[in-house]
Every structure is written in C-alpha cells, then in structure tokens.
Amino acid sequence: LGSDKLSDLMDGVFGSLDNIFPNATTADYCDLISWVMSNGLPSDMGGLLEGKLPSDLVPWLSGVLNPKRNQSPTRTDKNYDYYLDYQFNKKWDGGAQITTGLTYEHIRTFSGETEEVHQSDNVAAYMQYDQRFWDRLSVSAGVRAEYYRIDKHYREADTKVFGSKIPFRPVFRAGLNYQLADYSFLRTSFGQGYRNPSITEKYLRKDIGGVGVYPNYNVQPEKGFNAELGFKQGYKAGNLQGFADVAAFYTQYKDMVEFQFGLFNNADLSMINSVTDAIQMLKNGKGFGIGAQFHNVSKAQIYGMEISTNGMYTFNKNAKLLYNLGYVYTEPRDADYKKRNALENTYTDPLQMKEKSNDGKYLKYRPKHSFKATLDFQWKRINIGANVNWKSKMLAVDYIMLDERSKSEPDLLDYVRGILFGSSNGETLASYWKKHNTDYATVDMRFGVKATKEVAFQFMINNLLNKEYSYRPMAVGAPRTFVVKMDVTF
C-alpha cells in the first residue's frame, strides 16, 4: 500500500472505532484488548480471505461490545519456594577467616494461564577467604560454583575442565580495602557474574489488564563481570561530622537478559514480526496479545561513577540534622548497536520489530543521571524530614511503544500503535511520552511525633509539588498523596 492509501485506510478504521465506541477511553480499550487476548478471534478467520464469515461472529461481536461483562474468570498462579543454606565460619588469631557453605533452592510454579507446572533446582557451593594485614589492609577472595536445572533440562550451565564439560558454573570475586589514614579508605573489587534465566523469564504466560507476559524458551544465561574503585573519607568540623564516598564502576554483560514489548500470536505464543505472522495469527483464530518477553542482548557495557555523603549536624543534645546525599552518573551502552542498526536498516516488512525506539547507543529504560537527598531534623520526640529525587530523561524505550526516528509519513506500525494505545483529547502515547520524557524532580515531606515509648505517628505528603511525570511509557507517576501512619511497638 502507498502511504496515501494506507493513511486513508487507517483513518477509516479509526473513524469506524469512534462511531462504534464514541465515548471510549484508554481504559475501555485496555478492557477490550484484555478480552481479545483471553478469548481470541472468531473461528476460521482464514475463511475471510475467501469471503466466508465465521459462524461464531455474532457472539464474538457481543463480547467485543461489552468486554467487562464477558471477562474470563481470574486464573490463579501458585508458587512454592524451598530454601536451605548451611554455612561454616572459622577465624584465626592472625586475622585470617574462612567462610564456606552449601545452598539449595527448589522452586515449583503452577501457571493458571497455561495450566503447566515447572520446577527448578539450584545448588551452590561457596568459599571465601578474608585476611587483614598490618591493621590496614583487608584482602578478600572467594569462589562459588553453581548447578542449575529447569524441568528436564539438567545441564543449564556447562564449564569445560581439561577438555570435559561439567554441569557447574564457577564464578570468582576478590577485593582489597586499604586504610590510608584515620577515616581514609581506598578500595577496589572485581567479581564475575552468572545468572540462569528464571522460570518466570523462560516459561511465564500471564495476562494483566490487557498487557501480557510471554515465555521465551530460547533465552540464555547472562554472564559478565564488575570492577569498582572507590575512596571513602571521613570529615569533622565543629558539630558537623560524616563520610564522603567517590566510586567508579564498570560492568560488562554478555547475553544480558532484558524484556521487550511487542505483539504476540496467542496460538503459539510467538512474537508477531511480519505481515505473514499477522496473517497466520488471523488464521489460527486465537487472537493477538500485547506484552513483554525476556530475551538476550548480545553485549552491554555499563560504567559510571557515584558520589555520596552522609552525616549529622548536632545543634544541641536535643536537636540534630541527619543527611544523606547521592549522585550517580551512568553510561548504559549497547555494545552491538552499530551492527544491530545496520541489520534493522535492511528491514522491509512494515511489521518487523526493531529493538528500541531510536538508533542510539544506549540500553532501554535507563537514565544517565540521578540524584537523591534525604534530610531529617530531630528535636526531642518530633522529627521533620524531606526526600528529593531527581532523574534525567529516559534514553530509549521499546519500539512497539513509539518510534523516534524521523520519517516523512506515518508507517503501518504507527497506526497499529494508535489502535493499541488509543488517545485522550488528541494526546497519544507517543506525543505524551515525548512531552514528558524530560528531567524531573519530586519532593516528599514527612512529620512525625513519638507519643510514647511504644507509639509513634507520622504524617507524609508524597509528591508535595504535585509534579506530573512519566518514568516510562504507560506509567505516570502518582500525584500528590497524603499518608497517616501509626507504629506500635510491643
């Protein structure tokens, strides 16, 4: 279809929806989508290609016109978690210490949506050695070996040792902490990481108010390492005392697990990634769903720095001010973004899903800057406090939600987004997000009094300035709220 014909066609679709549902809100569309996700489409949708109407079209339309009345009953998930840990610790007079142990965890999950039972076992053996030298240097080193299985997949992780594969994955960590002077500390650490996908990430199928979670049987374990260098300094000036801390960090992942929103075929739970997939979904007659699926990002690098300070200013024996301030700078980079962009530039199918909303180098759903401040003034039995949180804009989101790339005409997915997410007073999800994806700050206040030794009251105002902000598409921050809390100690 040409862009003009496509525009005329979709304008007709939206006009028809407005005529059928003249007073529909975004919540109504969510009810409708949820109903279609649960009940599917009319049977034999493939017959429409031959001009034949499905035999159950009339009752299906009745459900569409009143999705709340025809909602399916709630399906309950059940989860059982059994955890056992044994730890042995031994100290010597010379400052050495060894900690070793075994951990076992068994998880059994029943999905009400698929009526399937999945089980996992995680066994780990670990050992850590700690030693202090010259009353200034602390050394720590450890190793942990893990075995993991889900259902009948008994070798979720393999390690090659002398040419043979064993079903255990070892990870190592080490750290140093050196006291340079009184209240001055230098530290460094290095640690490997390895995490198997959970039952939730691999097998979960759930529908929550029109948004689903879909399984990915092919998701792989994520692995990587983290390194940190930090300096901590104590300070005291008159009645003011506290600590300041500066740290730089670097983390690298391979096959990092992230979630991706998209459209799915409810017949086989696969992601709809082409017009052919959409036609097959119509033929299957089980309907579509919008939701998230966990998948692997080939390589990611996250580095940055953190600056923080906490302490106390004492006015007199009855009054003091406690504070905690922190700033974090992060560079969350997708190391393979150039290769992915080159591949996505070859896409020709109008329904083919891209990784994220832009061609940038950053991972999804992460800001670059964040700042947090907590202040508490205490006077006898009364305390007054405030929290200030500031975050910079989100760097990228999922492609199904919006496309930030420049284009001369809307494409097919832009119209699909309009149908999926609706609009309110001319405001679409994309336009609202572009307007509100900015730096934002929120302020919370609290006032408390300790009535007796056992009873305390606290009055809180969250989002004092009633700031309207959005920390991701379809998630608007709560408006100003008032909370009264009573604590009783027995």
Language-model features, listed with the residues they occupy:
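C-terminal beta-signal and adjacent terminal beta-strands/loops
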Residues: Y194-R195, K254-D255, F259-F264, N389-A430, ...
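Transmembrane beta-strands of outer-membrane beta-barrel pores
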Residues: S3, Y104-F110, V117, V123, ...
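Transmembrane beta-strands of outer-membrane beta-barrel proteins
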Residues: L1, A96-L102, V139-V143, L186-T188, ...
